[in-house]
A protein has these predicted regions:
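Positively charged n-region of N-terminal signal peptides that target proteins for export
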Residues: 1-4
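Bacterial N-terminal signal peptides
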Residues: 7-17
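Sequence-level preference for short, compositionally simple segments enriched
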Residues: 22-257
Length: 257
């Protein structure tokens, strides 16, 4: 799906908006609602204002049902924060940037400037939320990029096509999540445990592309997961992005194809 240039310019200006926003250290609970019934009408506005929590008292952003078309950035200072949707079917964070789009300099923005949700913070939790990139089958288009450590996802959906979920580094846990895409839709150098998750391949390609560093004991581990492949398509479980790639499927259901 093509986007208007104004939408792209707004997306690329996200970093400047974040820099101008002032975090409120005392704000540890916030409600996001599109209809104005909460504290904020956008997830990004709440993220920019929420304070850093603690292990015993995490900060929490509650997101009411709705489709939130925006880009969200959780910088490193947003540690011990929970982002909780009402339910993943009806609470959707979505954007449509893709690698071939042109930036302000006239050049393609590239893969790593496309994520709908860019997460740099450690000790972050996301629950009951759909995170989507709806650019379509136009090349690399990330739904989420995770650069923090100890990030937990529960009952979430990650929807896209190529490069849906990028786990750059750190250690992460996915429970009861759905991840959908076409090519390399789980990729990166992180250590990540996926428990009771569904992986849905929309086209013939590769599900994963790990770039596990040589010093890491594990890369991607899928335990009790289900792999579903679209009718008439054939997919591989993975391919190495770099040397030492490590991906393991155990006690999982592997669909035909």
């Amino acid at each position: 799906m093509r986007r208007k240039p104004a939408s792209l310019l707004a997306g690329l200006g996200l970093a400047a908006a974040i820099a101008a926003a002032q975090t409120d250290p005392g704000l540890l609970t916030a409600v996001v609602a599109k209809d104005g019934s909460g504290d904020f009408t956008t997830i990004q506005a709440a993220m920019a204002r929420i304070g850093m929590g603690s292990p015993g008292r995490p900060a929490t952003i509650y997101v009411r049902r709705g489709v939130y078309r925006e880009l969200v950035y959780a910088q490193r200072e947003k540690r011990y924060v929970r982002l909780i949707g009402e339910d993943p079917a009806n609470t959707v964070l979505v954007s449509g940037l893709h690698a071939g789009m042109r930036g302000l300099d006239g050049e393609a923005i590239g893969t790593f400037r496309t994520p709908t949700f860019h997460l740099d913070a450690d000790d972050f939790t996301v629950e009951n939320l759909t995170i989507q990139n709806d650019a379509g089958p136009v090349g690399q288009a990330l739904a989420i990029a995770v650069h923090g450590d100890r990030v937990v996802f529960r009952n979430c959906r990650f929807l896209g096509h190529q490069d849906t979920v990028f786990l750059n580094r750190g250690r992460h846990y996915f429970a009861g999540c759905t991840i959908e895409g076409t090519t390399d839709f789980v990729f990166g150098g992180a250590t990540a445990w996926f428990e009771s998750c569904d992986l849905r391949a929309l086209a013939s390609s590769y599900l994963t592309a790990a770039s596990t560093p040589p010093e890491a004991a594990f890369g991607f581990v899928f335990d009790r997961c289900r792999v579903q492949i679209a009718a008439g398509e054939r997919s591989y479980l993975g391919r190495p992005w770099r040397d030492h790639a490590a991906t393991l499927f155990m006690r999982s259901e592997l669909g035909a194809g």
